[in-house]
Structures are given as structure tokens and as C-alpha cells.
Amino acid sequence: FILPLVLSPYVSRVLGAQGVGVYSYTYSIAGMAALFGMLGVNHYGNRSIAAVRDDREKRSREFWNIWFWQIVLTMTAMSGYACYLRFFCSPGLRRVSAIQILTVLNSMADINWMFFGLEEFRLTVTRNVVIKGLAVLSVFAFVKEQQDLWIYVLIMACSVLLGNLVLWTQVGKYMDFRRPEWTRAKKHIPKLAVLFVPVVAVSVYQRMDKVMLGSLSVMEQSGYYENVEKIINIPKGVITALGTVMLPRMSYLISREETGLIEQYTARSMEFVMFSSSAMAFGIAAVANDFAPFF
């Protein structure tokens, strides 16, 4: 969550609003392709693993059958993104956009949902801290001027891919390999599609706004908007982290029909979200004038 506070002022001064805007625009387009590659897997996979986490055989079958669709959908998304690069991408953005294909590829390797479903948060948090720290150091070391935009894009994309690959080294501790079975795998598609609808709705205002800014205005405007949104996302990340933690816990309790605990956790979560979001909103408003010059 604090990465933008450390990195954004430096990147803004080295790459300028133009460079930040190009990164924001190209990343948003690649991110929408990656979103299709996941097709609701983050939420559905998290919930499915949590419901059967006490049975190693069942959770192994669930994991490999869900990941099978993740591969198929990611390959489809990469094909669509390749068509965008060939026929629709502006020549001036093609180099950066080509590097961003790693962002789409990341959706194939992303198995955070499996560890979240098992409530193994320590592993993912430790991985994030180490990889993000290396990414920050790499940016400071290799990004020195505006022409280094492609290096910045490569570092950010590779850091995510490396983080996902690190998690794969731990899969054997929690899962046994099971060949995906069509009869079992096909039942996931309708449920994935249902969960994909709200994800698409959220992505409309999270990603399309930057794409529209870059298309209808100059890239500098997209760059200014990107930095503002990064600051807003810092406190918002604390709120969304609660959902990431509570989803597997609630799914597990539902599978065990622990109604009392479900109601208790729901009430406490709502109280936390309302009070903390109000405090953070007023806090941002209070320091906005002092923060703006740095970003």
C-alpha cells in the first residue's frame, strides 16, 4: 500500500507526466485483457478452496480444474491483446504496449486465490514485501531519464510475474497434482461467469477512465490522474484487504453452517469499514494541499 508514497514522486520527476500517462494508459488496456483472463477466478477460486480446505483430495481437484480454465481464458485474452497490438495500437505506444503483454501473461500464473482460500496470508504478504522492495530498488537503479520508460514498464511487469512464480514453488505443500477432468471442470464456467459480472462493472470505472483520458486528451492528463488515484488507493487498499481476508473465512464458516459466527463477523466487518473509511477520507482531505506538490 505504501509503495506509491515511495516511488511515485521519483517516477513523476524522472518520467514526467507524459511518461506516467503512457504507462497508465497502456497498463489499463493490458489490465482489461488480464481481467478477462481471470474471469472471476480470484473470488470464485478463493471461495471454492476455502469451502474444501480441510480435505486435501477435494481441494487439489478444485484447484487444478479451476486453473485449467484460467489457462484457457488467459490464452484467449492474449490472442485478443495481440490483435490490439497489430491493428489498433498507436505506433508510438507499440513498444510499451508490447512489454505490457507480460501483464496479461501474469493472469495465467496468478494463484494468489489458492493461498487466500487456505488463509495462508503470511506467505503472500512476505512475498509481496520482498518482490516490491526489489522492484523499487530496480527503478531507482535503472530508471534515470524519460527514455527509460520501457525499463520502468518491464520492471513493474516482471516483478508481478516473478512474485506469482515464487508462489508456484510452494504449491506442492498444499496440493497434489490431479489431471483436470472435463466433467468436473465444465461446472465451474457458469459460476465463474456470474462472478465475472460484478468484476467487469468495477473495472469500468477503475480502468476505462484512464483509457478514455488517454484517447480523448493528451497523455499528460492521464499521468496526473494516475498519481491522484494512487494516493486514493492507499487507504482504499486497507478496506479491500479486509474483504480478501474475510472471504475465505466466511466461505469456510458457511460450509460448516456456523450461522452465529457469520453474523458476528459480518457486523464487525461493517463497523470497521464504515469507521475506518470515514477517518481515512477526512485524513486525505486534511493533508491534500501538502501532498499534491510531491505527486
Language model features with spans:
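Alpha-helical transmembrane segments of multi-pass membrane transporters/permeases
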Residues: 1, 57, 102, 115-141, ...
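Signature of the first transmembrane helix
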Residues: 1-42, 136, 193-216
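Alpha-helical transmembrane segments of multi-pass membrane transport and lipid-handling proteins
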Residues: 2, 37, 64-99, 165, ...
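Alpha-helical transmembrane segments of multi-pass membrane transporters
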Residues: 2-9, 80-81, 126-149, 162, ...
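Helix-loop junctions and terminal segments of transmembrane helices
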Residues: 9, 38-54, 228, 232-270, ...
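Membrane-interface helix-capping segments at transmembrane helix termini in multi-pass transporters
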Residues: 15-26, 52-65, 75-105, 145-153, ...
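C-terminal transmembrane helix end/exit motif
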Residues: 45, 111-122, 137, 141-144, ...
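Interhelical loop/hinge segments that connect adjacent transmembrane helices in multipass membrane
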Residues: 122-125, 149-156, 165-206, 245, ...
